[in-house]
Amino acid sequence: MPDSRTLWTAVVIICIAVSVFFSVKKRTTFKRLQQLMAAKQWDEFDRLLDGKLTSMLYPRYNRDYLRLNSYLLREDHERASEMFDLLLGLNLPKMQRVDLVIKAFNYYVGQEDRKKSKELLHEIKGFEGGQAEAVAHECQLMYDTMILKRHNDIPELERMLEDVGDDPVKRCRLEYLLALQYQNTGDEAKFQEFLEKSGQHSMAVNA
């Protein structure tokens, strides 16, 4: 009969093997989910995301966050809004909350949903630490431009664009806001100019 030391060694080996298995499956499952989203194979994506193994590998929030991203890619606005409502109603750690609120704000601003955008902007202005003030200011610019249809921030946006350097992500965002502000003034030429520049930087980011 095996002694306790042998049994303990066997248990440790089994635990390590199980840990390695789940670690590998977690990576491969996530990669597969990303591939299915990129290919827009939504039926297969839903089956994998709702499968028992995926439920064991990932917490509910992570799965629902992936589900939200899929609804955004599908442009299924009804289910995306339902998922935002569900996730925003959870008691989340600070960083998860910040990430989700900003994501929701960007979505609702894009949908020109004034009520929800305003509520989320109010919460964003209450964030503290790190780049909170800069993020809140940029979100205010987005709200003013896309919801209130203002154009009085053009000088500030042009200064920000001069100071941002070669960062394609920031340039893309600022150029897009400038395009919209010029559109709000009725300047079609400037709108097209900055929209084209924003598109070029967007392609550079996604290349």
Q: Positions of the model-derived regions?
A:
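N-terminal signal-anchor transmembrane alpha helix of single-pass membrane proteins
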Residues: M1-F30
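Generic helix N-cap/helix-start motif at coil->alpha-helix transitions
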Residues: F21-K31, M56-Y65, P93-I102, G130-L141, ...
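Residue at a conserved register position within TPR or TPR-like alpha-solenoid repeats
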Residues: L36, Y71, Y108, D144-L148, ...
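A membrane-cytosol interface segment of integral membrane proteins
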Residues: V98-L120
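Alpha-helical oligomerization segments
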Residues: E175-A207
